[in-house]
Amino acid sequence: MAYAVTARAALFTLATTLTLSAPAQAAVDAHCTESSMTLPPGALYPNGIARAADGTLYVGLITSGNVLRKRPGKAWETFFPGADTVFASNALRLDERRGLLWGNSPDFLSGGKTRANHIYALNVADGTLNRSLALPAGEMGNDIVLGADGTVYVTETRGGSILRLRPGEAAFSTLYQDPRLAAPSGLGAAGIVLLDDRLLAVANFGTGKLYTLSYNDPKPQLTEMQLPRLIENPDGMGLAPDGALIVLENGIQSGQGRILRIPSPKAAGMHRIEVLREGMESPVNLTITPQGCAFVSESRIRHRLLPGHESEVPDSFRLYQLPLPLTAAQ
C-alpha cells in the first residue's frame, strides 16, 4: 500500500535505461520483455497484483473492491465486483495450490465512512468470496505474503506488527510487534517478503527503513538492514529468483518512484542499493515469476493526498512488465 504520484513531466517511459553495477546480468526469460499495458476505463489506482502460472493476471484497486482478471490473449474482465467488506483490493497474493486469491481491504481514503479493515480470500475457480476476516479495531493491514504451507502473514501498518493466520485458524493473531515498525504518519509496516523459512524482510513505509525478522523463532528478533540511505516510502517488495530483494520506492514527497534491487539481503553489513527504474508514478505492488519477470502496478494516486489537487484524476493507469537482472543464485 503506498500512495504517491509524480507530475506529468516525470512520467515513466519504457525507454528508461537501466544502470547496474556488475555482475548483474539481464534476465534469461525470453518471453519477458519491457512493456506496459493500460487498464480499462474506470479502473482507477491499481495496487494489488498477482499472476498465475498460466499467465493470468489479477489486479486490485485502492479505492474499489473490484478485482480485474486478464487471461492470456483475452481482454480485461471483472473477476470480483467487490462486497460490503471488500471495498479495496490491495496486496493480492495467489495461492494456486489451495485455489485462493488473498487480498487486503483497508479503509484508506474512505471519504468519511468508517469501516472495519478486512483481509479476504476469493475462490479462484469462480470468483466468489471464500472468507472475509475483520481486523481488530484500530488495526489496518498493508501487505501480504503467503507461506508454502498456506500461512498468511500481514503487515499491520498502524501499530507496527506482523499478523499471522495459519491454516485452520479462524482469526489473525499477532506474531510480532515493535515500535520500530510503526511511524508517526500512521503508515508504518508495509512491504513484506519471506527470504527463506527463517527470515522475512519488512519495510517501514513512514521511516524509510528495512528490517529482517526471524519469524519462526520462539522469540523473533528484528534487525535493521544497513543501507547507504533511507528509502523514500518503501512499499511493495518481492524476492527475485537469485535471492535479491526488489523494493518499490513510492516517493511521496519527491514524486520520484523507483524500482530498487538489494543483492544478498540476508547478508550482514552494509547493503548496496541498485536503481532498476526511476521516474515512476508511485509504484506500489509487484509480483515476480520464477524466471525473474516482474509485473508492477503504478497507482498514480498522489494527487488525492495533495490539498487542492484532489480532482486531478489521471486519464489512464498502467501495469509494467520488466525482466529483472539476475546473478548466480545467492
Language-model regions, residue ranges each:
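A short helix->beta-strand "capping" segment at the edge of beta-propeller domains
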Residues: 27-44
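Beta-rich, blade/repeat-based domains predominating
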Residues: 40-56, 62, 83-109, 135-153, ...
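Short loop/turn segments immediately following the C-termini of beta-strands
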Residues: 62, 105-108, 157-159, 167, ...
